[in-house]
Amino acid sequence: MLLSGEKAGLRRREPCVMMGINQEGVGAMLDYICWDWNGTLLDDVPLCVAVMDGMLQRRGLPSLGGEARYREIFTFPVQEYYRAAGFDFGREPFEKLALEYIEEYDRKALDCPLHAGAAEVLEALEAQGLRQLIVSASKQKALEEQVGHAGVRGFFEALLGLEDSFARSKSGLALQYFSAHAVDARRVLFIGDTLHDWEVAQEAGCACVLLAQGHQSRRRLEAAGVPVLESVAQVPAFLGAQKGGRA
């Protein structure tokens, strides 16, 4: 689906001359950057930890123990994360817990900032001719509201979110968009912050770079065997190095 942006129409661009890396490490021309949202562009890990700790505290359960442990146990499907956090689905069903979580998260999500340098990175990549979109496990309405509030909606050709609150999978979103808009997945780089983002990239057939600033630790991300950067601010330099190394 193609959603209207804040800018008065998105420019049609010629294919970008920047080089990327596909799953085999072979240079490929990039047309698109496909971004994850939560943890990749939006700095929401502190909020996620605070909301979950509040839920645990209300039930007399131990806290998560900080962001470092959170990054070690957060996973998809999120049911497994809730179990690791200490919830017993025999006492409360996952759906009830997930709705409680998302209601509190949504009330506070607009207070979350973008990661340092994220807006500047989006602007720089747009200036280089790359088309950008977001594929997220967030609900569609919440995604649109958060991206708009952050002031970066105009950088994206599309925002692709899920239709429920349970964040089961987003694997089909990229494939559907690529098919509907004749996007060559070999010319797409997916940038995310979880192993699920890597799985989505694999299924879609595009390259992947992961960021260690988000919802999973560098140790876990490195198991994917793709480049892991410390932060979104490093993306332009990384892409520039790929271009220079394959020119």
Give the role of each language-model region.
Residues 62, 152-157, 184, 229:
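Conserved H-loop
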Residues 107-134, 140-144, 171:
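Short, acidic loop-to-helix structural element flanking the phosphoryl-transfer center
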Residues 6, 12-35, 187, 247:
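Non-catalytic pre-domain segments flanking phosphatase-related domains
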Residues 69-70, 153-168:
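A short, structured active-site edge motif that brings together acidic residues
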Residues 128-130, 180-185, 242:
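Glycine-rich phosphate-binding loop signature in dinucleotide/nucleotide-binding domains
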Residues 189-227:
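Acidic, Mg2+-coordinating phosphoryl-transfer loop and its flanking beta/alpha structural elements
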Residues 170-199:
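Conserved Lys-Pro-Asp/Glu-containing loop-to-beta segment of HAD-superfamily phosphomonoesterases
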Residues 30-120:
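N-terminal helical cap/lid subdomain that shapes the substrate entry/recognition surface
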